[in-house]
């Protein structure tokens, strides 16, 4: 539910919390079942606070052989944080996941997908092997600052389920309406075929509260 709370204080209602709570309560299990049926391993980007609030769910992901990567601490928008606040959010998130799983996460994705000019230098301070937050390419590449080299695995909004399937009743008109499922699947399959033919890196992003239902 942390994505709703970070978007706007107006979303701190039982309805919006319940939409987010569906993810760890039911959505994750549905996704794990589907992944197991097709023998697929995935990366789950987890906010640190989710590891604290839903430890059994996060442990189940890890014990099923999937990667746990970091998604901030409380799904903070890094564009609204000072450099020190960004460091604190990353460190708290790392601590929460490492305490629960026994492993330090090696991957990172920005909550809300936004940041400040300093953010990537800050991320590299924590020795992540890769980040997956930017939209400037369709193949992985290295980000270097002279001290640390990190792989960037770019993503695309049109391959994020939230873009099509999230519903919020108090969003502006025309925003966040649920799309026709067949159309969404057709979009994703067209992208997959094109990426395969062109030898690109296909990164699809699903959230338990949306695709998990």
Predicted regions and their residues:
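Glycine-rich, positively charged active-site loop/lid region within alpha/beta enzyme cores that binds
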Residues: 154-175
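Short, local alpha-helical segments
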Residues: 172-176, 204-211
């Amino acid at each position: 539910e942390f994505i709703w709370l970070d978007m706007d204080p107006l979303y701190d209602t039982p309805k919006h919390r319940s939409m987010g709570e569906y993810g760890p309560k039911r959505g994750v299990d549905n996704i794990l079942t589907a992944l197991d049926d097709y023998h697929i391993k995935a990366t789950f980007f987890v906010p640190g606070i989710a590891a604290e609030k839903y430890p059994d769910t996060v442990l189940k992901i890890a014990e099923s052989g999937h990667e746990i990567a970091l998604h901030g601490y409380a799904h903070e928008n890094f564009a609204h944080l000072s450099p020190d606040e960004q460091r604190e959010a990353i460190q708290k998130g790392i601590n929460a996941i490492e305490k629960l799983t026994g492993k330090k996460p090696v991957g990172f994705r920005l909550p809300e997908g936004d940041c400040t000019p300093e953010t990537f230098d800050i991320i590299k301070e924590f020795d992540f092997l890769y980040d997956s937050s930017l939209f400037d390419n369709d193949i992985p590449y290295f980000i270097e600052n002279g001290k640390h080299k990190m792989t960037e695995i770019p993503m695309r909004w049109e391959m994020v389920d939230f873009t099509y399937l999230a519903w919020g009743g108090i969003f502006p008109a025309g925003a966040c309406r649920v799309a026709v499922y067949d159309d969404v699947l057709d979009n994703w399959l067209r992208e997959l075929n094109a990426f395969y033919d062109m030898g690109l890196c296909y990164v699809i992003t699903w959230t338990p509260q949306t695709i998990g239902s």
